[in-house]
Amino acid sequence: MSFEQIKKVSVVIPIYNEEESLPLLLERTLAACKQLTQEYELILVDDGSSDKSAEILIQAAEQPENHIIAILLNRNYGQHSAIMAGFNQVNGDLIITLDADLQNPPEEIPRLVKTAEQGYDVVGTRRANRQDSLFRKTASKIINAMITKATGRSMGDYGCMLRAYRRHIVEAMLQCHERSTFIPILANTFARKTIEIDVAHAEREFGDSKYSFMKLINLMYDLLTCLTTAPLRLLSVVGSVIAVSGFLLAVLLMVLRLIFGAIWAAEGVFTLFALLFIFIGAQFVAMGLLGEYIGRIYNDVRARPRYFIQKVVGDNKTNDNQEEY
């Protein structure tokens, strides 16, 4: 497959309560883009920030000839929905995503462009010498292993959002309308040729991570139910094993009752209660997992917008109240 020459690069950055890091982010990202031989644009998506992030973005986008487009969402929809909103506005042949916390340096952008020029659909990244807590590193390894098992695509660091996508990959992703989206996995679904390179990783200088413990748990549920139906098959297997085990246990208890009498059966009542609680617990876990799938089906059937764009500023245009799916 031959690839068209990269004439323009679009950088999409989701923003959520990053007013402290925004001035430095804009300065470093624009400086990195100026090193490119291609044209470029910087698309910043405010994901319903409650601080002054939106005001800073508007001021930056209103400056003449600064290649910045600011997209304001009416509320917080989540990182990946915000990126999809940015994808809808891109004009580049290569689209790069970047987090706003500056843990992945914008200075890596030219290297991603050079790598993509070698003919790759997707350029992924691995965080070298990762500057995160042991908990976050462990959680990331578990999630990456789960994704690799479910997708069959071996990539070392799905959690790093510093990535480059060819335009046809982005257009394919925009055709997908599921409510829950994990962009790196979705992109690899359509990619024919991918690569992963090591990039620098720094400690977070401003604010705290937007992924709390509960959000990481929700992310794992999202990935589990978005990627595969294997858990449903596993439930069938586990249910069958429990049913057979219960039948065999019932036979065993009847035999023991015949041999040792009713006194033995009374003495084993607590064991029966323990087994009963185990089976009830397994049923509730299964019901919860089924509920996750049913809930996602319900959300998809309602077909509500994935996000709602309140305003677009920059690139010689200002639009209000644009609804996007």
From Swiss-Prot:
It comes from the Bacteria. Belongs to the glycosyltransferase 2 family. Its EC number is 2.4.2.53. The chain crosses the membrane at residues 235-255, 269-291. GO terms for biological process: 4-amino-4-deoxy-alpha-L-arabinopyranosyl undecaprenyl phosphate biosynthetic process; lipid A biosynthetic process; lipopolysaccharide biosynthetic process; response to antibiotic. GO terms for cellular component: plasma membrane. Keywords: Antibiotic resistance, Cell inner membrane, Cell membrane, Glycosyltransferase, Lipid A biosynthesis, Lipid biosynthesis, Lipid metabolism, Lipopolysaccharide biosynthesis, Membrane, Transferase, Transmembrane, Transmembrane helix. This is Undecaprenyl-phosphate 4-deoxy-4-formamido-L-arabinose transferase.
